[in-house]
A protein has these predicted regions:
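NAD(P)+-binding Rossmann beta1-loop-alpha1 motif at the extreme N-terminus of oxidoreductases
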Residues: 1-56, 60-63, 90, 120
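Hydrophobic beta-strand scaffold residues
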Residues: 28, 48-49, 110-111, 153, ...
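Hydrophobic residues in well-ordered beta-strands that form the structural core
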Residues: 30, 63, 88, 111-113, ...
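Short, structured coil segments at secondary-structure junctions
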Residues: 44-45, 82, 107, 149
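Rossmann-like NAD(P)-binding element
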Residues: 52-80, 84-94
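Rossmann-fold dinucleotide-binding core
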Residues: 65, 76, 91-170
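Helical "substrate-binding/catalytic lid" subdomain
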Residues: 161-285
Length: 290
């Protein structure tokens, strides 16, 4: 039975995700590299801000860091409680998940790669999708903790499978985003009212999350709120393309999309939302999508 839970990494997602845990668990430890943020979380949500060495003595340990390298470096420097389950919500590299799962198993520690989707609004409302790779028994034991932060908690395969699904999901997001930018620029060039076109498409077969929420709320509004940073989308599309190459599959659309997102990231303003990738296409066409 889970007696204590820890959350490591209180970024835009982690801060909101960890807030739900005290509703279900008596002891919830939080740690962040900027420790003032952990103390702020404790004050706001009733968690316990502790040093990293204490956090990794919890029964279930969540991590939500920028990259798999960050997670591996952190794990190498701590002594984790035997019998614990480590749930990594980072959008990470499948091979890294397999390495960590194998290494930690020798210490009687289970590792689940469990990236999430749903952006900050999903983290705030505990409606995230959690895609989980790893041992099924560990998944079942950790399920109550994951259910505190998400709506759909889905086991998708062995170690690395969760990271793989997340990478492909975000690649498909990028494909959708770029194709909608091209399509709507074409419509605007022909004098079509974009709001009217959006109404039609969202009641037709071409609709997607991009047309239903991202384009109207971020692009056409020109707001581009930063909830998922463009560099992170560039990272995830890179992971997805690596999976394609490892499988020796042809994927011309995915390859082209990854190169476009990478280029958009390199030319974007600092701290840009992923949706601002369309600005590079706007610069090419001199058509502003609004």
């Amino acid at each position: 039975m889970t007696q204590s839970v820890a959350f490591i990494g209180l970024g835009a997602m982690g801060y909101r995700m960890a807030a739900h845990l005290p509703k279900y668990f008596e002891k919830v430890y939080v740690w962040n590299r900027n420790f003032d943020k952990a103390k702020q979380h404790a004050t706001e949500f009733g968690t316990l801000a502790v040093e990293l060495a204490e956090a990794v003595q919890a029964d279930v340990i969540f991590s939500c860091l920028p990259t798999s390298d960050d997670v591996e470096t952190l794990i190498e420097g701590v002594n984790i409680k035997s019998g614990a389950i480590w749930i990594d919500c980072t959008s990470g590299v499948p091979e890294a998940a397999r390495r960590l799962a194998e290494r930690l198993k020798t210490q009687n520690i289970d590792f689940l790669d469990a990236p999430v989707s749903g952006q900050t609004i999903g983290a705030e409302n505990a409606t995230l999708t959690v895609m989980v790779g790893g041992d099924v028994n560990a998944f079942e034991r950790a399920y109550p903790a994951m259910a505190a932060i998400g709506k759909l908690i889905q086991h998708v395969g062995d170690s690395g499978a969760g990271f793989a699904v997340k990478a492909i999901n975000n690649m498909l997001l990028a494909v959708n985003l770029w194709s909608v930018a091209e399509g709507f620029s074409t419509l605007k060039a022909h004098g079509v009212n974009l709001d009217a076109a959006l109404n039609c498409i969202n009641a037709s077969s071409g609709k997607s999350m991009v047309t239903e929420t991202i384009f109207p709320q971020r692009v056409l509004s020109r707001e581009f709120p930063v909830t998922f940073a463009l560099p992170l989308l560039a990272k995830d599309t890179g992971i997805a393309l690596d999976l394609v190459h490892e499988a020796k599959l042809p994927a011309p659309i995915l390859a082209l999309t990854q190169s476009l997102i990478q280029a958009a990231n390199l030319t974007a303003e600092p701290n840009s939302d992923f949706s601002s990738a369309v600005k590079m296409y706007e610069a090419w066409t001199k058509i502003i999508l609004k």
